[in-house]
A protein has these predicted regions:
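Conserved SAM-binding loop
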Residues: 286-287
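Positively charged, low-complexity nucleic-acid-binding target-recognition regions
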Residues: 4, 291-300
Length: 300
């Protein structure tokens, strides 16, 4: 049985099998980029297709454990991330946008960029993905309608809306090209009319807007923290993702925990976490960081 607020020293493909379906609110993944970092673990796939096949396997597990409407942030090198996008829909996932992080010119210092014959890469890419709740809502509502034997007209009347053109009911259960997900107010009404107990917070996307933050981030300093992992992400960056797409008490999954930055961010923001890290050295460092963070005094 998987425990909360713990990192496991094992392959995430095996470890995630112990996590229940639809139980994770947010997943943050920073997998190996493949032939980008000069480390053995970044060269363990012989071909591009081998790498993509492996990614689809762990992404399938993330999609399974992620709750309906849950968010999945995936870091990666743009060249390899684009190879994964075509598989998202088949996994029940929807790409919302790409977040670009400008690391500044310091990142190319000392590199022989001229021989690359391309513009110097000074960015990190993050795919902002959700588990598509629109695919869930239509069959769920239709199932409740059939169970209660109600007509569309009866449901619209109970909702207090007109039935012209199918009414409000057809927007969420009809054959609309532009699928929609109900507002909280309408969901609460539907739960009463159709007699179901499914909290809105467990099927709606969580997004907490942050003033002045767009899809291009240039305020993240990759050099102010001591690095104990070659692809370590700044705590400020991870905290921003956590706070944007989860609430206090939610469960955050990190399949590639590295040295525990996501977990430290969860402790600081009062989220629960589950993590996996295969490398024993990094795992030990992550556990040490988390222990130190938990020992810090809190103001509240």
């Amino acid at each position: 049985m998987i425990e909360l607020n713990k990192i496991y020293n094992e392959d995430c493909l095996e470890g995630m099998k112990a996590i229940q379906d639809n139980s994770i609110d947010l997943a943050v993944a920073d997998p190996p980029y493949w032939k980008v970092i000069d480390e053995q673990w970044d060269y363990q796939w012989r071909t591009e297709s081998d790498y993509v096949e492996w990614c689809v396997k762990w992404m399938k597990e993330v999609a399974r454990v992620l709750r309906i409407g849950g968010t999945f942030y995936c870091f990666g090198y743009f060249r390899t991330l684009v190879l994964l996008i075509p598989y998202l829909e088949s996994l029940g996932l929807e790409l919302r946008q790409q977040i670009v992080i400008d690391k500044g010119m310091r990142v190319v210092s000392g590199r022989a960029t001229r021989r690359y014959k391309m513009f110097p890469n000074v960015t990190e890419s993050v795919l902002f993905i959700i588990k598509d709740n629109k695919k869930f809502v239509k069959p769920f509502l239709k199932e409740r309608q059939e169970a209660l034997g109600l007509t569309a007209k009866q449901i619209n009347e109970a909702l207090g809306v007109k039935s012209n053109g199918g009414g409000m009911w057809s927007i969420y259960t009809g054959n609309n090209v532009c699928e929609q997900f109900p507002t909280k107010e309408l969901w609460d009404k539907l739960s009463h009319v159709l007699s179901f107990d499914c909290p809105y917070e467990k099927v709606a996307q969580t997004f907490n807007p942050q003033i002045g933050v767009t899809d291009v981030w240039s305020d993240i300093n990759f050099y102010e923290e001591k690095h104990i992992h070659p692809t370590q992400k700044p705590l400020k960056l991870i905290r921003r993702l956590i706070k944007a797409s989860s609430n206090e008490g939610d469960i955050v999954l990190d399949p590639f925990s590295g040295v525990g930055t996501t977990q430290v961010g969860c402790v600081q923001t009062k989220r629960n976490f589950i993590g996996f890290e295969l490398n024993k050295e990094y795992y030990d460092k992550a556990c040490k960081r988390i222990k130190m963070e938990l020992a810090q005094p809190t103001l509240f």
